[in-house]
Each structure stands twice: as structure tokens, then as C-alpha cells.
Amino acid sequence: MGWIRASIRWIWGRVTWFWRVISRPSSFLSIGFLTLGGFICGVIFWGGFNTALEITNTEKFCTSCHEMRDNVYQELMPTVHFSNRSGVRASCPDCHVPHEWTDKIARKMQASKEVWGKIFGTISTREKFLEKRLELAKHEWARLKANDSLECRNCHAAVAMDFTKQTRRAPQIHERYLISGEKTCIDCHKGIAHQLPDMTGIEPGWLEPPELRGEEQAWLGGGAEAVHRYLATVETR
């Protein structure tokens, strides 16, 4: 039994020594060593933190959950933001995560609610997702409205637009609302990468054009499909 007591005393002695060192490091270690050690630990921590942060900013990470992979990602694939003649693709974080560091951290903190939803299966089935689609869309519309569609403008600049290459009504709308600052991208361009929810009662960002006045307003009567039909007719004019 004596060797057990000796082992315990030896372990306890090392624990108390370590505690004295970390509680009063300057009494045991030089200032230079502490400074260098603190710098190295800081670099390791910062590098690890940013590496983990960037891993969560990838399309692979976003679609690792079946809720995103089987719903919104499938809707993104047929759109021009996923595949186009120039080969420029907008991934999930390009549109849904701010690029500025401070805003990015704030968004990551907000994502804790999404982790909670994952754990408790808030949108674990297609039916649950469809029930929450409008609520989820409204949250994202409000976020983009608040930051003046910052993620859109990371790629699209009003000053770089060639109005001569746009459809007939687009330059008028952009000049009237976008260039003047009266509206922002998300006011008009909802549902560009994912299917729209039921849009009944949700006003569009644009005004009814004079040539359509007196006709049925698509966004008040037919939901998402009617809005898509209306946009299709606009593109052909």
C-alpha cells in the first residue's frame, strides 16, 4: 500500500506545481517566454478558429444536412445562379452569409437557432419544410432588406449594368427604383434561386405597369405560380 500512497503524493505534487505555475506564471517563467508562448498560442487559436469558420462557409457544409440538400438545393440547381454560359456559380454562402468579418460572425451566432431546429426536426420532412417556407423566406427577405441586399451587390453593381442589354422594362424599373435608392434588389427579385412560397397578400417590389392596369394582379390571386407566369410575360416584352 505504501507505493500507492507514494504515487498519490507524487501526482498531487505535480498538480500543485502546475497550479502554482498557471496561477503565477511570472514567478516561474520569463516574460520573454510568456510573450512568445502567448503569441504562438494566439496564432494557433486564430488559425484554428478561422479554418473552422471557413469550413462552415462551403456549399458542401451547407448541403450536408438533408433538409437543405433535398429541398432548397434541388431548387437552386435549375437556375441561372447555379449553371450558366459564363460558368460563374453562386454558392449557398455567397448569398446567405455576409462577406464582412463582423457581419459574418453575427450571422453565425444567429445560426445557432438553425442548429436548434436541426436537433428538433423543425423541417425534417418535405411537408414540414413547405409549412415553414413562407416564414423562412420572410426572415431572409427581411435580412437582405436591412442590409440593402449586400450579398446581391457583392456580384451585381448598378453602375456596371448595361441597360441596352436588358429587357425593355428592366432599365425603366432599375433607373426608377434601384439607381434612386428607393428600392433594393430583394424588393423585386424574390424567388430567383429558390421556389417562391404562397405569395398571396404579399405586395411585389414593383408597381403595376400602365399597360397592365385593369388586368388581374397575378401576385394577389395565384400565389407563386402566378408570379412566375407574370415574370415570364415581362421577359418576353
Swiss-Prot record:
One GO molecular-function entry: metal ion binding
PTM text: Binds 4 heme groups per subunit.
Amino-acid positions noted as binding heme 2 in the UniProt annotation, renumbered to this chain: 92, 95-96, 194
GO biological process terms held by the UniProt record: anaerobic respiration; denitrification pathway
Leader sequence residues: none
Residues annotated as binding heme 4: 185, 188-189
Annotated keywords: Cell inner membrane, Cell membrane, Electron transport, Heme, Iron, Membrane, Metal-binding, Transmembrane, Transmembrane helix, Transport
Residues that hold substrate according to the record: 108
Periplasmic membrane side: 50-237
Location(s) in or outside the cell: Cell inner membrane
InterPro entries (alphabetical): Cytochrome_c-type_ET, Multihaem_cyt_sf, NapC/NirT/NrfH, NapC/NirT_cyt_c_N, NapC/NirT_cytc_sf, NO3Rdtase_cyt_c_NapC/NirT
Coiled coil (UniProt feature): none
Mode of membrane association: Single-pass membrane protein
Functional description taken from the UniProt entry: Mediates electron flow from quinones to the NapAB complex.
Name the UniProt record assigns to this protein: Cytochrome c-type protein NapC
